[in-house]
Amino acid sequence: MLTGAIVISVWAGINLVMGLVVLVSVLLVTPHPLISRIVFTEAELAQLTPKTTGTIRSLAILQNASVVASAVLVLVVVWVGLAHGEYWAWWTLLGTLTFLQAMQFAGDAAIGTKTLPASVLMTLLAIVGLVFAGLGLW
């Protein structure tokens, strides 16, 4: 169970750090979030209207703030519940991580699978963590 808790914590930690980096970047450094630079060329970014750029930035801020908040909540559930053998924590994590990773693939499909390797890696990490945690509980 502890191995699963650690692996899920790594998953959450990666999401937390990436979410914070992108959030700080969008708020303080660059007018275009990372996803814009993945999807659009520099020439295409230059042609975006301020309204379009503002909308993309707004969504990136909300999305990355949600990533950070979700990661913190996952860490709390892992170390308050799962690490102490609470079955509810495993079921909560199963539902939450499954939903989040499924939505990652849906979002990735919307941009032409440009972030597919990262989506696959994070999904595998979540699955491994859940399997080890489940084996430790049952």
Question: Where in the sequence are the language-model features?
Answer:
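Aromatic-anchored segments of alpha-helical transmembrane domains
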Residues: L97-F105, V128-L130
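Core segments of transmembrane alpha-helices
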Residues: N15, S66-L75
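A loop-to-helix transmembrane entry motif
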Residues: H32-I35, K51-A69
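Membrane-interface helix-boundary signature
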Residues: M1-I8, T49-L59, E86-W90, I111, ...
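Membrane-helix boundary connector in multi-pass membrane proteins
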Residues: Q101-V120, W138
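N-terminal signal-anchor transmembrane alpha helix
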Residues: T3-I35
